[in-house]
Amino acid sequence: GEDWELQKNHNKRSVGLMLMNNSLCSGALINNTENDGTPYFLTAEHCTVGENASTFSFLFGWISPSTSCATVTGSQSGPMNMTISGSTKRAEYAPSDFSLLEINQSIPTGWDRVFAGWDRSGTIPDFTVAIHHPGGDVMKFARDNQSPDKINYSNPLYVWEIKDAFGGWDLGITEPGSSGSPLFDHNGRIIGQELGG
């Protein structure tokens, strides 16, 4: 919606499609507290577990000039020339399906990428937005206009639950390939990554 247009145009520049041996997932460049441009990439642990991160490839900026809103079909493909390969696992945690990679090269400045900010305060957002590559398609958006629930997923681990996630998005959908995509709050900060929905 118009209330998130500035954040959308900024944060979509952080999102990428991660290609592994026989699968793909979404994720995002995420900032650190030093704000030094270290190429950290947040994604889902189930995408990276047992895989050799040095073989991963990352595609950025795959945005359609004429996206069919809220569908995975009917979109035209945009340019696919911002690709970089190789990464190192820096952290992962299976209970929350979290994986943090460091891409082995700096992101070229000419790509005009951004490193998304994040918020771990636990403050309940007004609404949430996922930016992702469902089924490996061009970038799409899913939005839930309700505040998410904070649920006990695996004691003592709490996660955000999109109400009725399997069909509960008010705009768009998530599907295989969306895993690992950043979940943004109403302020445009990452509050988690997509798992199980």
Label each PLM-derived region with a short phrase.
Residues 28-36, 172-195:
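Catalytic nucleophile loop of clan PA
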Residues 1-162:
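Serine endopeptidase catalytic core focused on the charge-relay Asp
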Residues 1, 168-169:
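Active-site-adjacent structural elements in folded domains
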Residues 20, 128, 170-173, 185:
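Exposed boundary/loop context
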